[in-house]
Amino acid sequence: MTDWRFYIMDKRYAVLIDADNVSEKYIKPILDEISNEGVITYKRIYGDWTRPALASWKQALLNHSITPIQQYSYTTGKNSTDSAMIIDAMDILYSHNVDGFCIVSSDGDFTRLAARLRESGMHVVGMGEKKTPNPFIAACNRFVYLENLAQGEVSDTAEQDKDKSDDEVHEVVKTKTIKNA
């Protein structure tokens, strides 16, 4: 007989990836890492797939059943991919189908999105390269550096507790266990 308690206890996550700011070499470690948090119910990646720079993503998307979201670059210098990702995140939030989000980008433009999702009670895991701006890191409940995941090393995480004051310093620490409750 199936014990349904195990299914109910798993948190459901939406994984949203900014293809403009993340390399395809990180995809397996990203999915493995967030699977430690719960069940991935949405796997979406955003970019202008007509650009040759994103062609290398094709096999990774097929192998991991990730839905590519096409967003044309309408104007030079503007990032319409970010806008599409933010709109989708809000749609998913209001669907009430997830308990948390994993935002994968090294772009500080997602700082307000992470903060807004947390205001709505969502658990937000950020993932990005070490060049990620500190405000985005601080806006997430937990942040994981992709370089360490890809190398299979102990992950650097920048963790924030919702109860901490804004005046506290958020340190990047080495940890063997990077799963948070």
Residue spans of the language-model regions?
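Short, surface-exposed amphipathic charged segments that create phosphate/polyanion-binding patches used
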Residues: 84-88, 139, 158-164
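Domain-level signal for Mg2+-assisted phosphodiester chemistry and nucleotide/NA-binding surfaces
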Residues: 2-88, 93-94, 115, 123
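N-terminal regulatory modules in eukaryotic regulatory proteins
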Residues: 159-181
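Acidic beta-strand-to-loop metal/phosphate-binding motif
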Residues: 46, 99-106, 113, 117, ...
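Conserved nucleotide-binding/hydrolysis micro-motifs of P-loop NTPases
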Residues: 21-23, 49-52, 108-110, 131-132, ...
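Intrinsically disordered, low-complexity glycine/proline-rich and charged
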Residues: 115-156
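Conserved acidic residues
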Residues: 13, 99, 141
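A polyampholytic, Gly/Pro-enriched intrinsically disordered region
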Residues: 91-97, 146-154, 161
